[in-house]
Curated annotation (Swiss-Prot):
Origin species: Rattus norvegicus
Protein name: Krueppel-like factor 9
GO molecular function list: DNA-binding transcription activator activity, RNA polymerase II-specific; DNA-binding transcription factor activity; DNA-binding transcription factor activity, RNA polymerase II-specific; RNA polymerase II cis-regulatory region sequence-specific DNA binding; RNA polymerase II transcription regulatory region sequence-specific DNA binding; zinc ion binding
Name of the gene encoding the protein in the UniProt record: Klf9
Biased composition (Basic residues): 134-143
Pfam families in alphabetical order: zf-C2H2 (PF00096)
Length: 244
């Protein structure tokens, strides 16, 4: 038996008990003997005092009213209905956010269609629209490679231009060393190459006297020292950048 059915059963028992009891006669009245025969037996067996019978009668009435009032508000089905109504907008919002994030386009439902539907926008939908607009602006700042099959994305247009030269084969940075015909697509590549002609090794190990043309070669070498720390290379770079 469920809790609600049990409450109905107890309330019914209380009402039946109330109906089987009779009111206590006032002082000086002569009630009918037949009508008071059953209550007198109950009073004799259970209480033995008419005052106790009246208290028991009032208690039963109070319990019955309380059970009937509680039975009007059953908290069994209400949470399920509310949870369904609250979860469905979140599911719709999540589907729209996935489309906006992956494709970078706005959701299929336009603001005009939402207004025509007659439903007022909830605070969650307004908050999500603000997050989606920020994500859209962030995606517009990205620079995607237009070459078919590449799909790489860069945060700066200069990085995209340098990368696109890999597909086109363009090398606008030639080496100016005599009799050197090499060309490069990036200026930093030309700088590193030019040091091979000059013999310049400006990256010195902070723990020994070795020098290197490239910073990555220096880092790889310095990690072999047991007392090495990355901050040592940063300090050496600042010293080279400062004027003598």
């Amino acid at each position: 038996m469920s809790a609600a059915a049990y409450m109905d059963f107890v309330a019914a028992q209380c009402l039946v008990s109330i109906s089987n009891r009779a009111a206590v006669p006032e002082h000086g009245g002569a009630p009918d003997a037949e009508r008071l025969r059953l209550p007198e037996r109950e009073v004799t067996k259970e209480h033995g005092d008419p005052g106790d019978t009246w208290k028991d009668y009032c208690t039963l009435v109070t319990i019955a009213k309380s059970l009937l009032d509680l039975n009007k508000y059953r908290p069994i089905q209400t949470p399920s209905v509310c949870s369904d109504s609250l979860e469905s907008p979140d599911e719709d919002i999540g589907s729209d956010s996935d489309v906006t994030t992956e494709s970078g386009s706005s959701p299929s439902h336009s603001p005009e269609e939402r207004q025509d539907s007659g439903s007022a926008p909830s605070p969650l939908s307004l908050l999500h629209s603000g997050v989606a607009s920020k994500g859209k602006h962030a995606s517009e700042k990205r620079h995607k490679c237009p070459y078919s099959g590449c799909g790489k994305v860069y945060g700066k247009s200069s990085h995209l231009k340098a990368h696109y030269r890999v597909h086109t084969g363009e090398r606008p940075f030639p080496c100016t060393w005599p009799d050197c015909l090499k060309k490069f697509s990036r200026s930093d590549e030309l700088t590193r190459h030019y040091r091979t002609h000059t013999g310049e090794k400006q990256f010195r190990c902070p723990l020994c006297e070795k020098r290197f043309m490239r910073s990555d070669h220096l880092t790889k070498h310095a990690r072999r020292h047991t007392d090495f720390h990355p901050s040592m290379i940063k300090r050496s770079k600042k010293a080279l950048a400062s004027p003598l």
